[in-house]
């Protein structure tokens, strides 16, 4: 398993409970596939550099995870499907 740093941006229109549910769903993607969440930093609502899907702000979440390729692929798939996530990225640590 390798370490990855990731970030995703959640729609700012969600209430706190729904935002926490999205974060829990993403963590579950990794833990259900044998991965470990090493760190999660919720940056909160911040201005976007440019408008995304008519939003000028987003709720940023940055994380560090140790996971296999199947969890990485599932993370990408889930983030593309979930309408509450407007952007995501995952980068392999050296």
Regions found by a protein language model. Name each.
Residues 2-94:
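Structured, basic alpha/beta domains of bacterial-type, RNA-associated proteins
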